[in-house]
């Protein structure tokens, strides 16, 4: 869902882009998407750190379920 936001920028650059009918929202949206894509995995890791540690402890104590199927 798109939401209206306010962005501060250089007035001269804004006027030039506006004069050439450049889609300023598109210019801003792409870097925001890229940054959000970079931050989501970091947030997930922090939120799930305790669960991942518990899985690691379980595997350390009991081994992996796939260990018996390994051919190497």
Swiss-Prot record:
Pfam families: CcdA. InterPro entries: Post-segregation_anti-tox_CcdA. The keyword Repressor applies. Keywords: DNA-binding, Plasmid, Repressor, Toxin-antitoxin system, Transcription, Transcription regulation. It comes from the Bacteria. Homodimer in solution and when bound to DNA. Forms a complex with toxin CcdB; the CcdA-CcdB(2) trimer is sufficient for rejuvenation, whereas maximal operon repression occurs with CcdA(2)CcdB(2). This is Antitoxin CcdA. It comes from Escherichia coli. The gene is ccdA.
